[in-house]
Curated annotation (Swiss-Prot):
Protein kinase domain sequence ranges: 52-312
Residues modified to Phosphoserine: 427
GO biological process: DNA damage response; establishment of cell polarity; glucose homeostasis; intracellular signal transduction; intrinsic apoptotic signaling pathway by p53 class mediator; negative regulation of cell growth; protein autophosphorylation; regulation of cell growth
Pfam family name, one: Pkinase
Named cofactor requirement(s): Mg(2+); Mn(2+)
Subunit structure: Catalytic component of a trimeric complex composed of STK11/LKB1, STRAD (STRADA or STRADB) and CAB39/MO25 (CAB39/MO25alpha or CAB39L/MO25beta).
Tissue specificity field: Oocytes, eggs and early embryos.
Gene symbol of the encoding locus: stk11
InterPro entries linked: Kinase-like_dom_sf (IPR011009), LKB1_c (IPR039154), Prot_kinase_dom (IPR000719), Protein_kinase_ATP_BS (IPR017441), Ser/Thr_kinase_AS (IPR008271)
PTM note: Phosphorylated by a cAMP-dependent protein kinase. Autophosphorylated in a reaction that prefers Mn(2+) to Mg(2+).
Record's protein name: Serine/threonine-protein kinase stk11
Lineage: Eukaryota, Metazoa, Chordata, Craniata, Vertebrata
An example Gene Ontology molecular-function term: metal ion binding
Length: 432
């Protein structure tokens, strides 16, 4: 039997041993503060959708995400709207608006209207990819980047002239945009303005006598009195003139002509038609704004009257510094550099033993939708072939398709050959 004194001695020895062990562990395992940890960024894996290499996220809206991408055939920089069918079904008129936008954009070609380059569809994942020409920034993003929320007069004038050019083209094609606002005006690196988002636009019937419309889904702050007051019918073109007037008011003053705590109060104020123009706008701009924001649509300026106005025709001096394109909100990159470069590096480092990248290997094809009054591509080429020699067209870096559907095979042979050629092409691009 052990005596208490011997048990105490053994206990003290055990405690001493554990203490020595803990000191040893501290010496063996180097303890560092969490702030000293350097986290290795996750390697970006390349993903190809058809012939397009995906880049980083550019933005996200109610309809889906917008990402940058690179055309592996032409090496043109593109933007893509990624639309999920499940999400579109939850949005009122979501699928119908997207289909309408595709139908309209397919027949439009103008410097100041966004161009649709391609439409891809993944049947298994129920995804649609709308490939558009790339724009570096949105006008609303530029306005939000400065404290007073407006452009210098000369800069606003340049953008407004381009807006009128694009709007005149849309109207000449019988299209009412219905949602002109800074948030739907995009800009390229050289300052070219592009009218975008034709989801709520309306194509007038080719044989319609006027521009009468009956529905509107535009942004409330940019709607005219006839819509705010709930009229059954209204002039579609004059709605766009009013919205362009509110846009001009906003980009020159940083304010809105009509405001309200809620949509009901806002529409009440718009319906009355009472607004004021800041004195710093000057007499010429004030007169143009009053003409575009005329309560009576019949007296409201037409595009021809806007073009003939002295403020529109005047050459405005560069007195204030220009509002530049702001840095990217995600990466803070002031140059808005190509975001597909890390993915190109991933392709460049590919070896035969490695799994190359994620590849949308399901059925992906270009979709065509018939537009009222539009000649189908097959019929068009059949007609032109009999009267003139065939000629391959190239629209903004994309070749015209003779078929309405282009399927991508899921066989391993196609993947090996096509993907291999893309790797060689993109790797050569990176080395240059």
């Amino acid at each position: 039997m052990l005596c208490p004194s011997s048990m105490d001695e053994e206990g003290s020895e055990e405690i001493g041993f554990l203490g020595d062990l803990s000191v040893g562990m501290d010496t063996f395992i180097h303890r560092i503060d969490s702030t000293e940890v350097i986290y290795q960024p996750r390697r970006k894996r390349a993903k190809l959708v058809g012939k397009y290499l995906m880049g980083d996220l550019l933005g996200e809206g109610s309809y889906g995400k917008v990402k940058e991408m690179l055309d592996s055939d032409t090496l043109c920089r593109r933007a893509v709207k990624i639309l999920k069918k499940k999400k579109l079904r939850r949005i009122p008129n979501g699928e119908a608006n997207v289909k309408k936008e595709i139908q309209l954009l397919r027949r439009l070609r103008h410097r100041n209207v966004i161009q649709l380059v391609d439409v891809l569809y993944n049947e298994e994942k129920q995804k649609m990819y709308m490939v558009m020409e790339y724009c570096v920034c949105g006008m609303q993003e530029m306005l939000d980047s400065v404290q007073d929320k407006h452009f210098p007069v000369f800069q606003a004038h340049g953008y407004f002239c381009q807006l009128i050019d694009g709007l005149e083209y849309l109207h000449s094609q019988g299209i009412v945009h219905k949602d002109i606002k800074p948030g739907n005006l995009l800009l390229t690196t050289d300052g070219t303005l592009k009218i975008s988002d034709l989801g709520v636009a309306e194509a007038l019937h080719p044989f319609a006598e006027g521009d009468t419309c009956r529905t509107s889904q535009g942004s409330p702050a940019f709607q005219p009195p006839e819509i705010a007051n709930g009229l059954d019918t209204f002039s579609g073109f004059k709605v766009d003139i009013w919205s362009a007037g509110v846009t001009l008011y906003n980009i020159t003053t940083g304010l809105y002509p009509f405001e309200g705590d809620n949509i009901y109060k806002l529409f009440e104020n718009i319906g009355k038609g009472d607004y004021s123009i800041p004195e710093e706008c000057g007499p010429l701009l004030s007169d143009l704004l009053r003409g575009m924001l005329e309560y009576d649509p019949a007296k409201r300026f037409s595009i021809q009257q806007i073009r003939q106005h002295n403020w529109f025709r005047k050459k405005h001096p560069h007195m204030d510094p220009i509002v530049p394109i702001p840095p990217s909100p995600e990466t803070k990159d002031r140059w808005r550099s190509l975001t597909v470069v890390p993915y190109l590096e991933d392709l460049h480092g590919y070896s035969e033993e490695e799994d190359l990248c994620d590849f949308e290997d399901d059925i992906i094809y270009t979709q065509d939708f018939t537009v009222p009054g539009q000649v189908a591509e097959d019929d068009y080429f059949a007609q032109t072939q009999s009267t003139a020699p065939s000629k391959q067209l190239c629209m903004n870096g994309t070749e015209s398709q003779l078929k309405t559907e282009r399927r991508v095979s899921s066989s391993s042979q196609r993947k090996a050959s096509t993907t291999g050629s893309k790797v060689r092409k993109l790797s050569a691009c990176k080395q240059q």
